Each structure stands twice: as structure tokens, then as C-alpha cells.
Amino acid sequence: SVPSSDEMKKAQLQAQEQERIAWENAIPLGGKSCDVYCFDMALSVGDISDNGIGEQRKNVFKKMLSVCFVEDLDYQVEEKIQKIKTTLTSVIERYVAGEEIRIWYSYNPDELCGMYWLMKQLQPLNCQTTIYLVKLPTWEYGKENTMTSKIAWGEVSPGEWGNYITLQEKAN
């Protein structure tokens, strides 16, 4: 059955209250949202051995985006590549300037490949800057003696990320 408008309103208020409580209990990580970078590159697809974003990655994007974009495919691919290059340049500049990096990853293929790809981009720079790796646990205890499993960091609400900071380890 379809919920009534009163039931919908009640559910929305409950969700908002749960969100408020979650933020009140969140462990701050410091920094700003602009300090967080995402490399949306579908790195679990195709060869990831290129340095930076090369022709192989461009071809993967063309194949993947051709499903959605027909008329302006080349424009969409170039726009995506430029955004990724800008992001990578920013991360490298900050890394070279001595800012620590924290890479959040899991066994999700895109996240795991992304972690390896980014480490490969940073390795030749030979900086002494610390890189921390934070792996999402495969299993964890939930409320009321339950076990939960999350597949990727996208399943973790932003207010919960600080709970995992104790899992960070220095990269070799």
C-alpha cells in the first residue's frame, strides 16, 4: 500500500532526527570538504597501467559513455578527463608541498584499483610526505549484536568516517 502523506511526513521527520543525532555524534576529521578528492575513473575497467590519464583510460571512457552520450561523446570524454587531470594536479601539488594524504579504500574493485593507481602516480615523486591508507573493514559489529558488511565507502555516511580513522596505517 502507498503511505499516506502523514506517514511520509512522520518518516521524513524521523530521518531528519536520525541525521541530526548522527552529526552530533560524528568524530570530526578536520579539514574542509574541498580537501576531499574523488577520482571517478572506473579504474576497475580496462588497463590502469598508464601514467596519469592516458589514451587507454580515454578509450575506456569513450566505450562506457557511448551508452549515454551519442552526439557530444568526445566533448563529454574530454570534459571528464580535464576534471580528473585538474584533480590529480591538485593532489600532486599538495603532496609535494608536504600535505599528508589519506586514501580511503575497500575491496570494491574501483576503490582498490583507485588506491593502487593513485599510489603509482605519487611514487615517482619520491616525497617524504606521509600517505595514510584507511581500509574499510570487511565485517564490523553493528547495533544489538549484529554483524554488518559494507562493500564500499559510499555506504558510509560522512558523519561516520571519523569512526574509522583509528584503522589508518602508513603506506610503505
Model-identified regions with their sequence ranges:
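A short alpha->loop->secondary-structure connector
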Residues: A26, S33, W117-I131
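A structured, charge-rich N-terminal accessory region that forms the first stable segment of a protein
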Residues: S1-D74
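A short acidic (Asp/Glu
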Residues: V2, D47-S49, E111-K120, G142-T148
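Conserved beta-strand -> loop -> alpha-helix junction used to position metal-binding or nucleic-acid-contacting
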Residues: C34-M41, N126-N145, K150-W153
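Long, hydrophobic/aromatic-enriched structural stretches that serve as scaffold segments
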Residues: V67-W117
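Long, low-complexity intrinsically disordered regions
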Residues: G114-Y116, K120-Q121, L125, K135-L136, ...
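A conserved mid-domain beta-alpha-beta active-site/ligand-binding segment of alpha/beta enzyme cores
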Residues: T148-N172
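Short His-Asn-centered micro-motif
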Residues: S1, F39, W104-N108, V134-L136
